[in-house]
């Protein structure tokens, strides 16, 4: 059992306790009072309050270059200094939970994967927000409890080295990976159990389990930790064909002239990444202001400019023009142990 499994499995499910909504925000208002305020002077109050607070702390799993573009634009627009702590999604979750249980509240914004944000919701770490920009988002970006929202999609696709693999030779079905020509050429990320759940939902669990066992037995598969690393190994040619690459990262490298391109076998699996305001945020005005900024057309265009797949219906991108099946963060969390075990059985046990 991985450390991620032990941590997520140990989180207690919790009910959501609605906070009272006051008619106006106060100078020392709580996150609930700020986040749920919908008056006509909402933006003015957020900006004035954020400047008085003087700072913002973001915990994120986004790459530094990607988050840096958002943060830089926000700081320039509002004059609020932002502190960013970056780590893996599981570390973001673990730090947020550990600090909350110790009554140490330093996080204003959590910006990470959907399942981790859903875990924070269950731990009562996040605060529901009523933002005017929520109406612009695709339905799959919204949660019934409103405590986090999808800002972009991590779309799992396949990527290949264009010098090592010809486009006409690309597999069109998962069964095509049984061809001996793929022996020693396949790679996969170490912890993509939510991707596996999505694929199994498309082709059937019994059929998919048998098929992937045969693929690994016949042609092998290289298992690597981290999607950025896996994508870079495709570029270097060490892994000619990777099965679980985020299409935005492949597109970023392709635009820079790297020998990489991406495609989808069947329906691409999409998982929302998102943002949540901490329930005990020390800088609530700045937190809600950044939340609004990231899901506004301005923030979403910045994400699209980094080749992310934004969730706003007002921002177009060529990266979402493929059929997609969405991972439900709640289901991914509830069934995490099942799919992680199957993923390990299929790919990580006895593989390199």
Regions found by a protein language model. Name each.
Residues 317-352:
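Extracellular/periplasmic bilobal clamshell ligand-binding domains
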Residues 57-71, 83-100, 104-238:
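Extracytoplasmic ligand-binding site segments that recognize negatively charged/polar headgroups
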Residues 136-140, 153-156, 182-191, 212-217, 221-224, 294-315, ...:
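Periplasmic-binding protein-like
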Residues 70, 211-214, 282-294, 302-303:
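Short amphipathic alpha-helical coupling segments at ligand-binding clamshell hinges
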Residues 116-119, 240-259:
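A ligand-binding cleft/hinge motif common to bilobed small-molecule-binding domains
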């Amino acid at each position: 059992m991985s450390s991620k499994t032990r941590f997520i499995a140990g989180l207690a499910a919790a009910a959501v306790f609605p906070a009272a909504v006051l008619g106006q925000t106060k100078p020392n208002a709580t996150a609930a009072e700020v986040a749920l305020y919908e008056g006509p002077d909402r933006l003015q109050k957020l900006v004035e309050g954020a400047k008085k607070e003087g700072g913002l702390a973001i915990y994120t799993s986004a790459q530094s270059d990607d988050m840096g573009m958002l943060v830089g634009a926000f700081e320039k627009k509002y004059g609020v200094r932002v502190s960013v702590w970056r780590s893996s999604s599981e570390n973001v979750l673990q730090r947020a939970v550990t600090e909350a249980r110790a009554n140490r509240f330093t996080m204003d914004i959590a910006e990470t994967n959907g399942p981790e944000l859903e875990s924070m919701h269950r731990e009562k770490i996040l605060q529901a927000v009523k933002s005017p920009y929520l109406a612009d988002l695709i339905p799959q970006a919204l949660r019934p409890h409103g405590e986090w929202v999808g800002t972009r999609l991590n779309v799992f696709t396949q990527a290949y080295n264009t010098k090592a693999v010809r486009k006409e030779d690309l597999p069109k079905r998962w069964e095509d990976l049984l061809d001996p020509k793929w022996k020693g050429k396949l790679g996969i990320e170490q912890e993509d159990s939510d991707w596996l759940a999505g694929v199994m939902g498309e082709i059937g669990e019994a059929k998919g389990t048998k098929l992937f066992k045969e693929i690994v037995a016949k042609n092998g598969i290289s298992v690597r930790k981290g999607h950025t690393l896996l994508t870079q190994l495709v570029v270097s040619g060490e892994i000619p064909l990777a099965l679980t690459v985020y299409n935005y990262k492949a597109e970023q490298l392709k635009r820079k002239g790297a020998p990489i391109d991406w495609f989808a076998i069947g329906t691409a699996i999409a998982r929302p990444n998102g943002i949540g305001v901490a329930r005990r945020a020390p800088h609530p005005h700045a937190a809600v202001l950044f939340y609004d900024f990231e899901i506004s057309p301005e923030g979403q265009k910045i994400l699209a400019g980094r080749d992310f797949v934004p969730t706003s219906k007002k921002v177009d991108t060529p990266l979402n023009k493929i059929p997609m099946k969405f991972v439900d963060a709640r289901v991914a969390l509830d069934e995490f142990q099942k799919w992680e075990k199957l993923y390990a059985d299929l790919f990580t046990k006895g593989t390199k």
